[in-house]
């Protein structure tokens, strides 16, 4: 009798679980507002012209390189500023637009809106780029040459397309007599690639000093429109970053005894440190799946996946351990679910026949938003479990927690809708950005921070980011300009129900 009762109970439990799984699988579909697609035949479509391309090429040819904190090419930053002012005369002469130069090189535009009761928003980009080694490129990285409809140059992706896209859109709108209802800001920092402490940080302080207490949302660079990156999904996936990983660089140091290699000690400084490094690499931090933006991303994308994957991704509460194991097998997906660890430097010894007196290694962690810097330090210390290995913090930054991405969150939905107006077959989803941006310098005036680049990427293109042969297609440049046009016009409304229609008068 007891056995029968147990069987009945098990069947009942399994039946309930099955019902819950199926209900979530077929009802967990994210909001998708109806939007009017942006078409080249529309009267307000911004067509790419030779003049637009030349302006973009010239911006790319200016070597606004940042090398390290405080070390950036000041003359080139001034040259780029001059180029922007010559290229966009309406932006720089309109009574609706006020430009302030911040910290000598960063640019803050204030655009007046007629309805001061509407909360302003902020569009950001950065003027600087990372260095490039010309010998490794197919084309010189600062000539902006065109081949097969692609423009090759450092900054084509990161992030002069943002600067030029925003200003091209605003120049076009002003030429059509656009008078915004909602006030907004545009900010271009000059040292984002070296943490933004001289540029965006000062811009953020300036906005706060003006008494700005709140932004409706902030849009900066970030994730992109991805093709073929997510197995099982055929259509493009546009990921909107709602959070950023933090980072922690730890120095591991061992002090040993010097001596001659003919009379070796039982353990040398290098040997002790090597064992510590092996322990770190052999013991990855635990999966944080379900505690950060990755959960929202997978649930948003589940409805685009084949049925089996859809069932699993819609029910992470049940299948989370399985997904964590699968994701742990490959570096790109492993980085989504946990704090990752990289041993980046190892130094020890001065001569082949001399025992090293000390050894040093550097560990870089990219921290999941669900964990703190101190947690990671404590974890490493416990795993190493050797008092001879001294840990010290070289640099760190806390992770940025997730911004709201619900059905009624204005900023997220404006960005999502604008994306789908340009890339009509794309699906959008919130996600976690692995790198860091200038957005942290504005976190005191808004929590609605989003990170998205209007860049189309195919498998392999991710290596061009900060890498060799960075490029953007002319078609993608046109899409980027029209994306920012839609951001400005859509955000000008006072609610999500009033998305800009192409027939609307500006």
Predicted features along the sequence, with ranges:
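N-terminal Sec-pathway targeting helices
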Residues: 1-14
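An extended, acidic, His-containing surface patch that forms the Zn2+-binding/catalytic region
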Residues: 7, 47, 98-102, 116, ...
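Acidic/His- and Gly-rich active-site-bordering loop/insert found
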Residues: 11-154, 175-182, 363
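Short, solvent-exposed loop/turn segments at the edges of secondary structure
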Residues: 104, 139, 181, 214, ...
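Acidic/histidine-rich catalytic neighborhood of metal-dependent amide-processing enzymes
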Residues: 150-151, 157-239
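A short core secondary-structure module
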Residues: 201-205, 257, 262-286
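Flexible glycine/proline-rich, aromatic-decorated loop/lid segments
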Residues: 222-223, 234-249, 452-462, 466
